[in-house]
A protein has these predicted regions:
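Short alpha-helical segments used as structural interaction elements across diverse proteins
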Residues: 8, 51-52, 71
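Short amphipathic alpha-helical heptad-repeat segments
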Residues: 43-56
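Long, non-catalytic architectural segments outside compact domain cores
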Residues: 1-46, 96
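Short, compact, well-ordered microdomains
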Residues: 57-96
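Generic secondary-structure transition motif, activating predominantly at the C-termini of alpha-helices
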Residues: 23, 27, 55-62
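Acidic-enriched, low-complexity/disordered segments with a strong bias for Aspartate over Glutamate
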Residues: 1, 53, 89-91
């Protein structure tokens, strides 16, 4: 379950707080197409998997103190990941 994955991820509180602040201005269409070359028409699980993979790569770079690590991109990915997880959770709770 990919939504469980998000809840088990341990990241610095400052990154999570910044990502949560980003939820206020998160624009799904713009974010997915501009930053991640993802389509809103893709299955939500595909989008979530892509975001999880990208966040994992960024976190690895952060931990290795890689010179090309981009904290702003990391926050953007975390924001999208949180927003998309909430969207899936909301869809799963809607009656059929």
């Amino acid at each position: 379950d990919m939504t469980f994955h998000l809840h088990s991820v341990k990241r610095p509180k400052i990154l999570i707080n910044a990502a949560n602040l980003g939820l206020e201005t998160y624009n799904r269409a713009t974010c997915l197409s501009s930053f991640f070359a993802l389509s809103m028409h893709q299955h939500p699980a595909q989008i979530l998997r892509s975001l999880i993979d990208k966040e994992g790569q960024l976190n690895k770079m952060r931990l290795q103190q890689h010179v090309q690590y981009n904290i702003a991109l990391h926050v953007t990915v975390l924001t999208a990941l949180i927003a998309e997880t909430k969207e899936i959770d909301r869809d799963e709770k809607q009656p059929i």
